[in-house]
Amino acid sequence: MVLLTMIARVADGLPLAASMQEDEQSGRDLQQYQSQAKQLFRKLNEQSPTRCTLEAGAMAFHYIIEKGVCYLVLCEAAFPKKLAFAYLEDLQSEFDEQHGKKVPTVSRPYSFIEFDTYIQKTKKLYIDSRARRNLGSINTELQDVQRIMVANIEEVLQRGEALSALDSKANNLSSLSKKYRQDAKYLNMRSTYAKLAAVAVFFIMLIVYVRFWWL
């Protein structure tokens, strides 16, 4: 289920639009998650990963950054990640068309609060079970969800570390992993060549032995 949607300007973390669903039955305090989202916006910068999932216990934040604007959604952790990012891409496309040119000029929080109407309509589309099945069958080219950076929201906020630093660490780990695979491949090739050389030496010695003793 989609519980909270927020849109903010990356340059200064200014909230541009939002839509929150009160969930009285389960007693969830979405104000806490909204506060975490605002803290997250203030940590974003131009070097932050453009696609990210932040785990928050039974919930998960997903966000995308396009043209200096961050689109963030809070979902139950079990909500399909692919649908969450498809939902964000849908919002991004419409918001950019309606308000994209005005984003750099506004100074008042929630200047585009009227965009909530579109958010609510789109959210219903992605929550409806039949619509979700149809959307799930579409071969979208949004991104490979397996490659999206995943972190923990509490660690990110408490550590006081910019998401760009986390992204840098993720890239370093990826580089180290790639180097390890290359080194392993090189060692395997050397081992194979050594075995072939040993076999060649054996046959050469055998030929020399036969020629020397039998001819």
From Swiss-Prot:
Keyword Transmembrane helix: yes
Sequence intervals crossing the membrane: 195-215
InterPro entries in the record: Longin-like_dom_sf, Longin_dom, Sec22, Synaptobrevin-like, V_SNARE_CC
Residue numbers on the Cytoplasmic membrane side: 1-194
Stretch forming the signal peptide: none
SMART domains per the UniProt record, alphabetical: Longin
Subunit structure comment from the entry: Component of 2 distinct SNARE complexes.
Free-text function comment from the UniProt entry: SNARE involved in targeting and fusion of ER-derived transport vesicles with the Golgi complex as well as Golgi-derived retrograde transport vesicles with the ER.
Protein name: Vesicle-trafficking protein SEC22b
Natural source organism: Gallus gallus (Chicken)
UniProt gene name: SEC22B
